[in-house]
Regions:
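Glycine-rich phosphate-binding loop of ATP-dependent small-molecule kinases
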Residues: 1-198
Length: 198
């Protein structure tokens, strides 16, 4: 989802607001909020709503969000979705990527992230030019703790329990756009754009 969000962001010229990236930066910087979030992230659990929503609201006031934005990683619960509505944060469309759990596990196992700048790669689908080295800054590519198989399985259980109910929440509001897996990032992204323009 993050890779598709980045591509859409470039094509639509609007920022992707990734809660994961914002939280990881806070953890790396050792901010009080980052330290609070770290224990949840390391366990593959969801970070409390008040932490997530505070970060999101602050970020959406930036000038680059004036013409729109893509939220990646929020909302993850009905409570977060309702809180976003109460904060006056308007969500026009919700993209629902229809991907099997086994495919997600395989994709996450191949993900690598730059330890310096946070750029994301995949050993098969989006490799760096030099194995293990970031194309952007030359930093080392690493496997994040939350991409390890046992953590991915825990995250999927959490998704099915807490996030999957959002499908009906947004479908009832006429905002849900279901996107079947198209087999490649490029094909999926083209399909998403076509559906958003419909």
């Amino acid at each position: 989802k993050g890779t598709n969000a980045e591509i859409l962001s470039d094509k639509l010229n609007i920022p992707t607001i990734s809660t994961g990236n914002i939280l990881r930066a806070a953890v790396k910087d050792g901010t009080p909020m980052g330290l609070k979030a770290k224990s949840f992230m390391d366990a593959g659990a969801l970070v409390p709503d008040e932490v997530i929503l505070g970060i999101i609201k602050e970020r959406l006031t930036a000038s680059d969000c004036a013409n729109g934005f893509i939220l990646d990683g929020v909302p993850r619960t009905i409570a977060q979705a309702e809180a976003l509505e109460q904060l006056g944060i308007e969500i026009d469309k919700v993209v629902n990527l229809l991907v099997e759990d086994s495919t997600i596990e395989a994709r996450m196992a191949g993900r690598r992230v730059c330890a310096k700048c946070g750029a994301s790669y995949h050993i098969k689908n989006k490799p760096s030019k030099v194995e293990g080295v970031c194309d952007r800054c030359g930093g080392e590519l690493v496997i994040r703790k939350d991409d390890r198989p046992e953590t991915v399985r825990d995250r999927l259980v959490t998704y099915h329990q807490q996030t999957e109910p959002l499908v009906d929440f947004y479908r009832k509001r006429g905002k849900l756009v279901d996107i079947p897996d198209q087999g490649s990032i490029e094909a999926t992204n083209a399909y998403i754009l076509k559906q958003l323009e419909a």
